[in-house]
Amino acid sequence: MPTPPVEYRLTTRDAVLVRPSLALCEPLRRALQDSYVEHAPFLDWVTPQVNAEQVLRSLKGAIANYAVPLAEKRLFLLSADRAEVIGCIGLQPRGRGESYVIGYWASSRFAGQGYLSAALREVCGQLPRVRLYLTTSSANPRSQRLAEAAGFRLVRTLRGVRNDAWHGTQDTLIYRREPPA
C-alpha cells in the first residue's frame, strides 16, 4: 500500500501539503474554530468551540496513524509561510490498501480559491495505481464540484440516507476515480 510522502510541494498553488505535526496545533485550532458555521452541516465531528487540548489529541492520533498500515492518513494543506491551515485531506485505506476513501475540508477563509482542488489532484496523482472513492452530501454542491474537478465521477446515489437540521433529508453521492488504464 502506498504511504503518502512526508511533504508535497504543490505546483499549481502557493501552498504545501504536509503530514501532521504538533506544530500545527494553533493554526489548526483557528481554522476549525473559524470554519464551524460552514462545516457543521456536513461534518459530524466539528464542535462550536475548539480548544488546544482537543486539537493536540487529534494531531497525536493522526501522527500515530502513520505507523498503522490501514489507519487513516491525514495531510494538512498549509499556506506557503506555514502560518495558516488551508484544509485537510484524509486517506482511509480499504481492504488491503487497494483502494482509499478520501475525506477533506477547507478553511472558510480559503474555500473556493482552488487550493483544495489542486491539493486533491496532487494527492491523487501520487496514488496512480489505486481506486479512490469519496462521498458527499447532495446538499453540498461545492464538494461535488471539487470531486469532479479532481477527476472523480459520480457512480452511485444513496437516496435519503442523510438527515440533519440544516438540510433535512439528503442523498449521499458516491464518487470514484479509477487508476489510469
Predicted features along the sequence, with ranges:
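Short, P/G- and charge-enriched loop/turn segments at secondary-structure junctions
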Residues: 62-65, 162-163
